[in-house]
A protein has these predicted regions:
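Long, contiguous, secondary-structure-rich segments that constitute the structural scaffold
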Residues: 1-47, 51-126
């Protein structure tokens, strides 16, 4: 065990807003909902560069998002525009797992892998 495992990961409170993404929709139509291409465009959150620094992560790192008892791991992407305290997620199973939008949540770095869509679907059924 590493010493870092005992330390709490820094968190950042954010408001999450969802949006439709044309590239994600195209990947779904071209490759299917269960494809890696679709997951790579869907299981993401766009964060402000300042928020990334607060939680000690960089573009492409996995993050855990927690909201009202629900949680999901997605890939953090650095936004080109400044919007501190606001995270943007494409409309998908990964964003829907967190609840009704806009939703208040905390985001922190994660060591876990991004769950596949079939894993998320089975989690929501059980």
């Amino acid at each position: 065990m590493q010493f870092e495992e005992f330390l709490a990961a820094p968190e950042c409170k954010i408001m999450i807003v969802t949006y439709p993404d044309i590239f994600q929709i195209e990947a779904k139509l071209k490759y299917g909902k269960f494809s890696r291409e679709y997951q790579d465009l869907s299981a993401i959150i766009m964060l402000d560069s300042g928020d990334l620094k607060k939680i000690g992560i960089k573009d492409g790192d996995p993050v855990a998002i927690k909201s009202e008892g629900m949680n999901v791991v997605v890939t953090a992407k650095e936004s080109e525009e400044e919007h501190p305290g606001i995270g943007y997620m494409p409309e998908s199973v990964w964003s829907n797992i967190l609840g009704v939008y806009p939703v208040s949540a905390t985001v922190s770095r994660s060591q876990q892998e991004i769950p596949a869509i079939d894993e998320l679907l089975s989690r929501s059924v059980s």
